[in-house]
UniProtKB/Swiss-Prot annotation:
Protein name as catalogued: Putative uncharacterized transmembrane protein PB15E9.06
Localization: Membrane
Record key words, sorted: Membrane, Transmembrane, Transmembrane helix
Membrane topology listed for this record: Multi-pass membrane protein
TM regions (residue ranges): 9-29, 35-55, 65-85
Entry GO terms, CC: membrane
Species annotation: Schizosaccharomyces pombe (strain 972 / ATCC 24843) (Fission yeast)
């Protein structure tokens, strides 16, 4: 149930970021940058939610936050870093 709510929130943020960046891409940001920024926002929300679940909702508390991050997708880090680096361009 809670994962379904999280999926809906992430989907809403993903759609909102796509709309926002597609509007702003008409002015200054290229479409490739807008897609990477929206993907980075989507994966950032998913990673933060997983940290919240593993730190506050799991019965067994992790000793370090590094081990609390589950592997979501092998492309998470490149998408996030590509999105943040494209903001600087």
């Amino acid at each position: 149930m809670k994962l379904n709510v999280c999926f809906r929130i992430c989907n809403f943020l993903f759609q909102f970021s796509l709309e926002f960046f597609s509007i702003s891409s008409l002015h200054s940001i290229s479409s490739l940058h807008s897609i990477s920024l929206s993907l980075s926002l989507f994966f950032l929300v998913a990673i933060l939610y997983n940290i919240y679940i593993y730190l506050f909702r799991s019965k067994k508390k992790p000793k370090r936050i590094l081990f609390a991050i589950p592997p979501l997708c092998p492309l998470c880090s490149p998408c996030f870093f590509f999105g943040t680096s494209s903001m600087l361009l």
